[in-house]
From Swiss-Prot:
Belongs to the ATG5 family. It is a peripheral membrane protein. Conjugated to ATG12; which is essential for autophagy. Keywords: Autophagy, Isopeptide bond, Membrane, Protein transport, Transport, Ubl conjugation. Coiled coil: none annotated. There is a cross-link at residue 160 (Glycyl lysine isopeptide (Lys-Gly) (interchain with G-Cter in ATG12)). GO terms for molecular function: Atg8-family ligase activity. The gene is ATG5. Conjugated with ATG12. This is Autophagy protein 5. Involved in cytoplasm to vacuole transport (Cvt) and autophagic vesicle formation. Autophagy is essential for maintenance of amino acid levels and protein synthesis under nitrogen starvation. Required for selective autophagic degradation of the nucleus (nucleophagy). Also required for mitophagy, which eliminates defective or superfluous mitochondria in order to fulfill cellular energy requirements and prevent excess ROS production. The keyword Phosphoprotein does not apply. InterPro entries: Atg5, ATG5_HBR, Atg5_HR, ATG5_UblA, Atg5_UblA_dom_sf, ATG5_UblB. It comes from Lodderomyces elongisporus (strain ATCC 11503 / CBS 2605 / JCM 1781 / NBRC 1676 / NRRL YB-4239).
Length: 286
């Protein structure tokens, strides 16, 4: 199968994917001692989350908003997290992957409404669910939670893993100096695609394997693999999820990847990889 697109089309696709976002409505329920049900006020915080970014990139602005609410006594060192239908969201996964895996199955034909999430604030009565989602272990000078440092550390670890799969060694990323590594990781927050591509290309010397994660429907199970770059998408899915192939839809960046089934993983990865250099595929049961 030939290349997916021309160079110009490839650049435009990458730009659109980089800037792709999801509308979020975050419900903030403030618990007070005066009311019978324990809830004094409920606030809505509307925002946009980049598909290929991570939930904690939104947290500093959310915290600033919470601090301005009249009924909140917010502690700087209290971490926050988001839940969907009572389940804490794993912030180390891209926002778009969470959306495609958890929300899209019920809204595939109607995605006009924002994704509604519940905000939680850690306290003595509501501990942070560190047994389920990655804890935040860094603090800023003022004692507040340093979400940015946790994101950068997580992304660096992910990049090391994908670098090893791609090159057969993690040396390319280990050879970056400290400022280069920090800049590369921070670009998910600063959103400079050109600079990200420049530094990311420095750690991709050759492609021996493609890092792929397949998220299965109605489960937390994930099929992870280092995949032959020349395998077709349909052959990969037949190999990994043979019983679901005929009754499911593969989703990449919120897009039906059915038309890509006869393309090689190498071509698909080049256009649709996330900033951690992983190709994420969510399996949807229509």
């Amino acid at each position: 199968m030939s290349k997916l697109t021309s160079i110009e089309e490839n650049i435009e696709i990458k730009r659109r994917l980089w800037n792709g976002s999801i509308s979020l409505k975050i419900i903030i329920s403030i618990v007070g001692e005066s009311s019978e049900d324990g809830i004094t006020n409920e606030y809505e915080y509307l925002t946009e989350g980049y598909r290929n970014a991570y939930l904690p990139t939104l947290y500093p602005n959310i915290v600033s908003y919470i601090k301005k609410l009249p009924t909140v006594a917010f502690s700087n060192n209290s971490p926050i997290w988001l839940e969907y239908e009572g389940v804490p969201l794993r912030w180390n996964l891209p926002i778009g992957v969470l959306y495609d895996h958890l929300y899209l199955p019920a809204k595939f034909t109607n995605q006009s409404t924002p994704w509604t999430l519940d905000l939680k604030i850690a306290s003595s009565t509501l501990p942070y669910p560190s047994n389920y989602i990655v804890p935040f272990t860094y603090s800023a000078e003022d004692g507040s939670v340093n979400y940015t440092k946790s994101i950068n550390e997580m992304l660096l670890n992910q990049l090391k893993q994908s670098c090893y799969v791609l090159n057969g060694t993690a040396k390319p990323i280990m050879q970056l100096n400290g400022p280069e590594t920090e800049l590369l990781c921070n670009l998910v927050i600063t959103r400079n695609l050109k600079t990200y591509n420049f530094f990311n290309n420095k750690i991709i010397k050759q492609i021996r394997g493609i890092p792929v994660r397949i998220y299965l429907p109605n489960t937390q199970l994930v099929a992870q693999a280092a995949v032959d770059p020349h395998i077709l998408l349909q052959d990969l899915l037949l190999e990994r999820i043979p019983t679901l192939m005929e009754v499911s839809v593969p989703i990449i960046h919120g897009i039906d990847a059915g038309p890509l089934l006869k393309f090689q993983l190498n071509d698909i990865w080049h256009q649709f990889k996330h900033p951690d250099n992983v190709l994420y595929i969510s399996i949807l049961m229509p």
